[in-house]
A protein has these predicted regions:
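Donor nucleotide-sugar binding/catalytic pocket of nucleotide-sugar-dependent glycosyltransferases
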Residues: 61-75, 79-95
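Nucleotide-sugar-dependent
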Residues: 163-201, 207-215
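Short beta-strand scaffold positions
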Residues: 65, 207-208, 226
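Extended catalytic core of nucleotide-activated donor transferases of GT-like folds
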Residues: 1-74
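Histidine-centered beta-alpha loop that forms part of the nucleotide-sugar donor binding/catalytic region
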Residues: 7-8, 37-40, 68, 86-90, ...
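Conserved catalytic-core segment of nucleotide-activated headgroup transferases in glycan assembly
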Residues: 91-164
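A short acidic/histidine/glycine-rich donor-binding loop in glycosyltransferase catalytic cores
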Residues: 220-226
Length: 261
């Protein structure tokens, strides 16, 4: 038998207790424990040491991590368990999105829009030739530029059916020039659920070229990877409709897998 656990456990203070429970379970005959990593809070939040988090992770027989870069990070910091790459998270969607002939917005940004995680949204007024649509919580609407519309917040299960835009942006930090700070560093090893959100909605993506997901996006031609949002602006303005449609066709293959689990 296999027992699957998730990491980090919510509430976080129970993660150590859960790791202890996994040790007890693993001692049962013919029972193996598997851990699915959603986030590494030692990097994302800095609310515990890397060594303590690795100790929790080492309590399981096998670990499902995001990608090769996260796998290397875990091994370099003392993870001794079998590591398996997930690559992309599922994003189960019930229902079909209404077909939009021509999206009113160039770029959609969904998720945690707090100033700590997404402070860059208040600099998007400098990218005045593009129109942005924001979905999520933590927005200070009065500080947004005239080219930015706040569309509200929706539950994760219906969000893919609500968002509209020609491109979905995966970006963190307070700069439009690059992803910086702890959240920016985390993108170098993390596969954000946001990527699966956009793909489940059939939207091509824009990602930072130093992020872990840039490899997937480039290899399977699911969007573009850029050094800055200004660079994205230039590409979007010059990409042909034929090339854009080719990317959309590539996404459909992944969408079918992601939304069905």
């Amino acid at each position: 038998d296999i027992v699957v656990f998730e990491h980090p456990y919510i509430p976080a203070e129970y993660s150590s207790a859960l790791a202890f429970l996994s040790k007890l379970v693993s001692k049962l005959k013919k029972v193996k424990t598997v851990l699915i990593i959603h986030d590494l809070n030692s990097i994302r939040l800095g609310n515990l040491t890397i060594s303590k988090e690795i100790k929790q992770i080492n309590s399981y027989d096998a670990v499902i991590c995001h990608n090769d870069l996260m796998k290397s990070f875990l091994q370099q910091n003392g993870c001794t368990k079998k590591l398996i790459n997930l690559w992309l998270f599922d994003y189960i969607v019930k229902g079909e999105k209404e077909t939009i002939q021509k999206a009113d917005y160039d770029i959609v940004i969904a998720g945690n829009l707090s100033i700590e995680k997404s402070g860059y949204i208040y600099s998007l007024k400098k990218v005045s030739s593009l129109k942005f649509a924001l979905y999520g919580i933590g927005v200070m609407e009065e500080k947004l530029g005239g080219n930015i519309s706040y569309m509200g917040s929706f539950s994760p299960d219906i969000l893919p059916l609500k968002i509209e835009g020609r491109w979905g942006l995966v970006w963190d930090g307070d700069s439009i020039d690059r992803c910086i700070g702890d959240n920016g560093e985390y993108l170098k090893i993390n596969n954000p659920h946001k990527l699966s959100l956009y793909l489940s909605s059939g939207i091509p993506v824009i990602v930072w070229n130093k992020s872990a997901i840039a490899f997937i996006v480039n290899h399977y031609q699911l969007g573009i990877s850029v050094s800055s949002i200004k660079e994205a602006e230039h590409i979007i303005k010059h990409i042909s409709e034929e090339k854009y449609q080719e990317i959309c066709d590539n996404i459909q293959i992944f969408k079918e897998r992601i939304v069905s689990g």
